[in-house]
Amino acid sequence: MAHTRTFTSRNRSVSLSNPSFSIDGFDNSTVTLGYTGPLRTQRIRPPLVQMSGPIHSTRRTEPLFSPSPQESPDSSSTVDVPPEDDFVFKNANLLRSGQLGMCNDPYCTTCPSYYNRQAAQLHTSRVSASRFRTVLYGDARGWAKRFASSVRRCLPGIMNPHSKFVQVWTRVLAFSSLVAIFIDPLFFFLLLIQQDNKCIAIDWRATKVLVSLRSITDLIFFINILLQFRLAYVAPESRIVGAGQLVDHPRKIARHYFRGKFLLDMFIVFPIPQIMILRIIPLHLGTRREESEKQILRATVLFQYIPKLYRLLPLLAGQTSTGFIFESAWANFVINLLTFMLAGHAVGSCWYLSALQRVKKCMLNAWNISADERRNLIDCARGSYASKSQRDLWRDNASVNACFQENGYTYGIYLKAVNLTNESSFFTRFSYSLYWGFQQISTLAGNLSPSYSVGEVFFTMGIIGLGLLLFARLIGNMHNFLQSLDRRRMEMMLRKRDVEQWMSHRRLPEDIRKRVREVERYTWAATRGVNEELLFENMPDDLQRDIRRHLFKFLKKVRIFSLMDESVLDSIRERLKQRTYIRSSTVLHHRGLVEKMVFIVRGEMESIGEDGSVLPLSEGDVCGEELLTWCLSSINPDGTRIKMPPKGLVSNRNVRCVTNVEAFSLSVADLEDVTSLFSRFLRSHRVQGAIRYESPYWRLRAAMQIQVAWRYRKRQLQRLNTAHSNSNR
C-alpha cells in the first residue's frame, strides 16, 4: 500500500505541536509549533514528493506547513521561547533571579504579590528553554553561548531590595561601615615620638592591624558597589501616585547608580590612608614636606569620614530602601549618642596629630643644622645615617629637651598632648585623646585657651560649632524620646484642663463638677486614654472579630448568652460600647425607659425592686435583659417587625452602682437589629427558657409572682377554713 511521506535529510528533524506553557503575565494564547525542519543549516526546500516504499534520505527538506510570510526563515526552525531581552513580564529580571528577586518584607507596598509565586517557576522555565536551545543548536557559536551561560550563572541576578539576602547584607555593610568610621581616625595615632632618641617613629605593629582592618572594610564596601549594579530601585517618578514601581532593567540600574552615588562610593572606598601611612609619609618623615603630607592625611581621612557618616547614619536609622535595621526609640537614642561619640573620636584624633606636628616644629627650630642631618635625627628609621656623637648631641640639646616641657614652646591647646605623644602604648594615646575630644564637645571647648596660631583658633571654633550642633541635636532627640514616653500623661493633663475650662464656661455647680472629675479620672484609668473604636477602624474584619472575642469573653460567662450561637455573639460584640460609671450612679430609673442592656465587667451594682427587694449584681451579670424579650416580642417568626407601642419598655426597678463600674452597653436600636437578624434562633424554646430561667430580672419577677400566688392561695385557704368552721357551728 502506498503511503505519502516526506523526504527528510540526514539531520533528524523535530516536530512540535505542543501548546506553549503559560505563566501569569504571559498572553494566554496557545502557540502551536507545527513546523518541521532541519536543526542546523537549511537549504532550498522542494515541493512535496509522494512515493511508496521505505523512506530514503534526501538532500532537501520540505515543511509540513508553510511558514507565514511575516516569519523569518530562522524563526521557523527554532523553539518559540521568549528571549531574555524581550521578556513580556513586568519586572521579569526580578522573577528570573529566584530567591534573590523575592520580596521578604511583610510590610512591603511596592512589590506585587505575584513575585513570590512565580519567581521559581519562571526561573526553571527559562533555564530549561536555554538548555534546550543550546542542545538544539550545536553550531560554531554554541561554545560561546555555553560559556556566556556558565558565566551568567555565577553572577547574581537582579536583586529585590526587600529580599532576605539584601537585608542580611545591609546589616553586614552597616557593621563594616561602623568599624571603618571608627578605624579611620586611628591612623593619626600611628605616629609617635620616642623621647629617648627625640625622634618620630611609626608604630608598625598597630599599622599592620589597622591597614588590614581598613582593607577588609574597603573590600566589603567595594563588593557593595558591585551589588548596586544588580539591585533594583524604586523609580522616583512613580512615587507621585501610588507606592512606587521597581525598576529591574540592568542598564537602567547601572545608569541610575552612575548618576547617583557611584562617585561618592568610589571616593569612600579609595585606600588613601593606607597609601599615605605605608608609602608617602615614611619617605618624607623628618622633612618639612612631611607637614603638608600630614595635612593631606588629616584632610583625606576627614573628607572620607563625612561621606561615610552620610551613608551610614541613614542606613542605621532605617531611611533606606533596603529595609530597617534599628526601628525603636531606644535605637534612635543610641544612634544619636553614637554620633556624639564618633565626633569626639574625630576631634581627639585631630588634636593628637596637631600636637605631634607642633612638637616636631619645635624640634626642627631647636638646632640650626642642615636639612639632611635634621631628617636623619628626627626620623627614627634613618637614625643609622647619623653618627653616634651627633645623636648624643641631639639628645642632650637643651633646646630640643625644652620642646617637651610646658614653658619650652607655645603649644596653646595642645599642651596636654605633648607628653602624650611620647607614650608607647597605642591604647593610652587613643583613650586619652577620646576623653579629651568628648570633654571638649560636651563643654563646648569652655576650658580651652588657644594661642595666636590661626589654625589653632579655627580648630577651637570648629569644636565649639560642632559641639553646639551635636548637643542641640542630642538634647532635642532625647527630649522627643522622653516626651514620647510621657505622652499619655501629657494628654491626660490637657484633657483635664479642657474639661475644667468647659465646666467653668458652663458654670456647672460644684457637686456636678466633682462627679465629672471622678468620671474623667476613672474613664482614663479604664481606657488608658486609647480610643478603641478608632483603632478598630483600620483593621480587617477578621482581626476585629478575633480581638472582640478576646475582649468580650465575659459574654460566654453571662448566663443569658451561654446557649447562644457564636454568630449571634459576634453580632452583639460588634455593637457593644464601653461605658464607665462612678459610685452612686443610677443606671436604670423606676418608671423610666429601659434604653440599653449593661454588661458588667468590673464593679458592683444593686437592683432595687418596687417592693424594696435588693438584688446584687457583680462581674458577669446583666441589667436591662428584659429588653431582649421585649425586642423578640416585636418580631414575627418570619423575621418581619410588628407594630409596637412607641413609648418603649418601662423599668419597674432602680439600678445603681455600689462601686465604680466598668461595663459595656447594648442600645435598643442595636438589640433590635440583632433580634431581627437572628429571630429564628432567639425565639427557640431553649433560648427563651434560658433567658427566663437564668436572668436575674426574670427570676426576681418569677419569685415575686410565686409570692403573690402563695399569698393569694394562703388567703383562699383561710377563707375556706373560716367558711368551714362557720358551717360546723
From Swiss-Prot:
Residues forming coiled coils: none
UniProt-recorded name of the protein: Putative cyclic nucleotide-gated ion channel 19
Region annotated Calmodulin-binding, chain positions: 678-694
Q: How does it sit in the membrane?
A: Multi-pass membrane protein
**Keyword Acetylation part of the UniProt annotation:** no
Entry-linked CDD domains: CAP_ED (cd00038)
Secretion signal: which residues? none
Where does the record place the region Disordered?
Answer: 52-82
Record Gene3D superfamilies: 1.10.287.70, Helix hairpin bin, Jelly Rolls
Keyword annotations for this protein, in alphabetical order, are: Calmodulin-binding, cAMP, cAMP-binding, Cell membrane, cGMP, cGMP-binding, Ion channel, Ion transport, Ligand-gated ion channel, Membrane, Nucleotide-binding, Transmembrane, Transmembrane helix, Transport
Sequence similarity:
Belongs to the cyclic nucleotide-gated cation channel (TC 1.A.1.5) family.
What does the entry list as the binding residues for a nucleoside 3',5'-cyclic phosphate?
A: 560-677
